[in-house]
Amino acid sequence: MRKQVEIFTDGSCLGNPGPGGYGAVLRYKQHEKALSAGYRLTTNNRMELMAAIAALETLTTDCDIVLSTDSQYVRQGITSWIHNWKKRSWKTADKKPVKNVDLWKRLDTAIQRHSVRWEWVKGHAGHPENERCDELARAAASAPTLDDTGYQAE
């Protein structure tokens, strides 16, 4: 039987673009693991994506996952938009390159071995795990140590 894992994620950016960070909490039975990292120059959407990617890439076995995010961009992108992006060789409906394609490809790879149910939660609405992820993300953004090598200024 596959492990039942809950994942909560959030991304933060001070400026957008600017210093950013992500926070994620993984829960399996009574075990909890918190993840966070800060980047010197990035965007809020990249950090929302990185939160989900980091959490999923941490798992070493196939799992049944409920992943909660306050990012409609991430939830809609991975459950809906990505199918047509892939059919169109990672182009949008108006034939422009998909933004953050490096992270979308990485997220697509990260979910393949798992069964993932994506849930949206309203941000800054008192959801305890989302608030905790927000705190982790903001703290990481306030003290960034990494370079977001995939970030491309527009």
From Swiss-Prot:
Pfam families according to UniProt: RNase_H
HAMAP family for the chain: RNase_H
UniProt keywords, alphabetically: Cytoplasm, Endonuclease, Hydrolase, Magnesium, Metal-binding, Nuclease
GO terms, molecular function: magnesium ion binding; nucleic acid binding; RNA-DNA hybrid ribonuclease activity
Function: Endonuclease that specifically degrades the RNA of RNA-DNA hybrids.
UniProt name for this protein: Ribonuclease H
Reaction(s) catalysed by this chain's protein: Endonucleolytic cleavage to 5'-phosphomonoester
Source organism (scientific name): Pectobacterium atrosepticum (strain SCRI 1043 / ATCC BAA-672)
EC number: 3.1.26.4
GO cellular component terms listed in the entry, alphabetical order: cytoplasm
Binding of Mg(2+) 1, residues: D10, E48, D70
Binding site for Mg(2+) 2: D10, D134
Domain of life: Bacteria
GO biological process: DNA replication, removal of RNA primer
Annotated family: Belongs to the RNase H family.
Domain called RNase H type-1: residue spans: 1-142
Cofactors that this protein relies on: Mg(2+)
